[in-house]
Amino acid sequence: MSAPTTPAAALDDVEEGVVLRPKFDAAGLVTCVTTDAQSGDVLMVAFMNDEALKKTIDSGEAWYFSRSRGRLWRKGESSGHVQRVLEIRVDCDQDAVWIKVEQGGGAACHTGRKSCFYRRVDRDAEGAPLLSPVDAERLFDPAKVYR
């Protein structure tokens, strides 16, 4: 199954229609929110280009586009922590994607943590923003996995 990605469509068709018509930004990317299918926890936020979205739909595994590396990558290609996609959704105007996954290896973050969202914004005694670890246990050692 290949995803049609027609760029232009009537607003009603985009918001209420049944045809996948992702609205990619000027760089050809769409934001992807990835959550754990069982717990609902946010694991990561990444980007997909047209090819990454098609590969994700066709393979049932999460593919993303790395802005820093300028290339497509399959989640888990280095770590072995592959994301098996159970559901894909788009938002109302199809400019964001939400995928629900089973996270292989238990960790989605390259830092070795379950989620990339392992710090909460709190305030110090003077009221300045301060980052506090939350659910920050490392499930693997990145130095050993990404050699």
From Swiss-Prot:
Gene that encodes it: hisI
Family: Belongs to the PRA-CH family.
UniProt key word Transferase: no
Cofactors, names only: Mg(2+); Zn(2+)
Cofactor binding note: Binds 1 Mg(2+) ion per subunit. Binds 1 zinc ion per subunit.
Ligand binding (Mg(2+)): 91, 93, 95
GO biological process, one term: L-histidine biosynthetic process
Reactions accelerated catalytically: 1-(5-phospho-beta-D-ribosyl)-5'-AMP + H2O = 1-(5-phospho-beta-D-ribosyl)-5-[(5-phospho-beta-D-ribosylamino)methylideneamino]imidazole-4-carboxamide
Pfam families per record: PRA-CH
Location of this chain's protein in the cell: Cytoplasm
SUBUNIT field: Homodimer.
Name of the protein in question: Phosphoribosyl-AMP cyclohydrolase
